[in-house]
């Protein structure tokens, strides 16, 4: 028997199960093909060394191509309950829904080739749409960040001296000069020193004193790493001293130089990977209960600071005495799930003048842990004027006066959307086991209301709605959440973007104490410079309004200086040269 997943209908659960099984079949075929090759096989060498391709490609060449998908789902039955006239109506065979058993070496059958072309077409359209979307996102990012530069005091500021970051990337390291984000690899320095070091092992006190002397300029995280690594090493006092000196030298060399256009570098470092991201909304691997926006659409959603994400979700962790029990987790989940009257009835009846009858479904009431009394209470507190008569499994509502059909139907719809229990906006809940504890995952987000529910760990609720975090926990929490969301969105796509870039974008978006988007309604549209605003979008109205208000152009940023042909005050343009001319006589 099929195990039903919470939050999915029987059809959706079956579909999820079939897709999972077909995916396993493809992997199995690929693995058996992979195992049949020896180490000298050219394709195997390419995949193993990481030169090109992966075991998936080998599986498709020698095993089976697997399921072809369109918009993250199997090929739909668009032609009178079948994908093509070659299949029977409502045929459950995987072949009829785009599963390709052949591989590239043997070649595809006619029908398989057709389904494969359908999947391939989506890839081409996806690429065409993606380039323009990511291109526009990069343009917005560059416009918002271009005027940021590093000052001589190590801060990142805009042309008017407003501080965006007190220390670039929280450690002042230039990503281009670093070793995968680190100024130096302490393990490597210790290793190279230990080869020639021959003195007596330094004591713990000696190492601590030496490190304290050198690491005042390091950031706390780096100081801790250096100290821990040196304490574990077997170096002498002289060796420790040499390592500290070398580390300090490398750290100084890896710092960002004053005047550097950190803003433009950041915009390009986030914009460029955008072209490599996927556009579609996929399901979580394994968990098919909730849709989550991933890839480029999610990245655009974050930098645009959309008030509501397309797919808001929450991960709710439970208190100590609840998290190990599945029954208690289900009980809490039922309290969270938004339950309307429409979810509890089997049918409604009306005479279209004064009476509306609600026939309640006992199974649905049991599933949502509700009673008829709960429904009556919800109706009484809804402030609608009608008489309520519960009898058996039904509730009859009588309006105070006769009304026309439209009024009665409108009233019925309002009654059906009345909340009985739960948190508004949370439309679906799923409980998932993570290690030994149970976690509640939701579709829909509402932190403020979830906090009021008993049994949840109030310090451990996660949501992907940044605006909600800013409204409930403040701008600092929103800034940290924005960094985490941007990082995980890029990492999920297998893209390596340094966290310093993500931090700068997040800090700029939150620098005014509230969330600002990158585009014309946010940072780009609130720039002080008239020419910079006009050069981006809505040119004529911007100039007309500025003229009306009598604004003055100070020519302190990048765009405005390019327009008038003056020196850009970034990089070498930051410095003014003065020369004393000594006149004879």
Locate predicted features.
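Intrinsically disordered, low-complexity regulatory segments
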Residues: 110, 114, 123-131, 137-138, ...
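General helical secondary-structure elements
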Residues: 22, 134-135
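Non-transmembrane, amphipathic alpha-helical segments
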Residues: 10-17, 43-46, 50, 129, ...
């Amino acid at each position: 028997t099929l195990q039903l997943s919470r939050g999915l209908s029987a059809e959706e659960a079956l579909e999820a199960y079939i897709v999972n099984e077909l995916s396993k079949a493809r992997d199995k075929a690929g693995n058996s093909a992979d195992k049949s090759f020896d180490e000298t096989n050219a394709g195997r060498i390419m995949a193993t060394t990481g030169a090109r391709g992966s075991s998936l490609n080998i599986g498709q060449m020698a095993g089976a191509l697997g399921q072809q998908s369109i918009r993250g789902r199997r090929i739909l039955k668009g032609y009178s309950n079948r994908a093509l006239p070659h299949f029977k109506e409502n045929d459950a065979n995987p072949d009829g829904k785009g599963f390709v058993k052949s591989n590239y070496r043997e070649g595809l059958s006619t029908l398989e080739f057709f389904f494969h072309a359908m999947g391939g077409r989506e890839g081409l359209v996806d690429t065409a749409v993606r380039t323009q979307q990511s291109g526009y996102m990069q343009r917005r990012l560059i416009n918002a960040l271009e005027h940021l530069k590093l000052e001589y005091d190590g801060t990142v500021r805009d042309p008017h001296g407003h501080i965006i970051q007190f220390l670039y990337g929280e450690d002042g390291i230039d990503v281009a000069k670093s070793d995968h984000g680190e100024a130096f690899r302490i393990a490597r320095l210790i290793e190279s020193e230990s080869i020639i070091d021959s003195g007596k092992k330094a004591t713990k006190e000696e190492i601590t004193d030496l490190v304290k002397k050198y690491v005042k300029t390091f950031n706390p995280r780096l100081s801790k790493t250096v100290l821990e690594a040196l304490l574990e090493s077997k170096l002498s006092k002289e060796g420790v001293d040499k390592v500290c000196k070398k580390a300090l030298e490398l750290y100084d060399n890896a710092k960002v130089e004053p005047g550097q256009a950190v803003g433009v570098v950041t915009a390009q470092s986030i914009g460029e990977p955008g072209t490599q991201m996927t556009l579609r909304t996929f399901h979580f691997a394994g968990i098919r209960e909730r849709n989550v926006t991933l890839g480029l659409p999610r990245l655009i959603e974050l930098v645009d600071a959309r008030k509501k994400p397309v797919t808001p979700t929450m991960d709710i962790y439970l208190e100590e005495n609840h998290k190990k029990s599945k029954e208690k987790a289900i009980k809490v989940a039922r309290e969270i799930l938004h339950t309307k009257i429409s979810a509890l009835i089997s049918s409604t009846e009306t005479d279209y003048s004064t009476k509306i009858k609600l026939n309640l479904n006992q199974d649905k009431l049991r599933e949502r842990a509700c009673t008829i009394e709960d429904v009556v209470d919800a109706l009484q507190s809804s402030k609608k004027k009608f008489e309520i008569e519960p009898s058996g499994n039904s509730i009859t509502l009588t309006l105070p006066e006769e009304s026309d059909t439209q009024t009665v139907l409108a009233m019925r719809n309002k009654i059906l959307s009345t909340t009985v229990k739960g948190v508004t906006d949370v439309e679906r809940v799923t409980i998932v086991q993570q290690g030994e504890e149970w976690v509640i995952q939701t579709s829909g987000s509402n932190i403020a209301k979830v906090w009021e529910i008993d049994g949840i760990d109030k310090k451990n609720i996660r949501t992907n709605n940044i605006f909600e975090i800013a409204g409930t926990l403040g701008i600092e929490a929103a800034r940290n959440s924005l960094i985490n969301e941007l990082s995980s969105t890029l990492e999920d796509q297998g893209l390596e973007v340094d966290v310093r870039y993500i931090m700068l974008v997040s800090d700029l978006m939150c620098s005014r104490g509230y969330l600002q988007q990158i585009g014309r309604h946010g940072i780009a549209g609130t720039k002080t410079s008239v020419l910079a605003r006009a050069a981006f979008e809505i040119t004529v109205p911007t100039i007309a309004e500025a003229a009306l208000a009598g604004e003055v152009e100070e020519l302190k940023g990048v765009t405005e200086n390019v327009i008038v042909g003056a020196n850009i005050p970034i990089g070498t343009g930051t410095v003014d040269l003065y020369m004393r001319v000594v006149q004879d006589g």
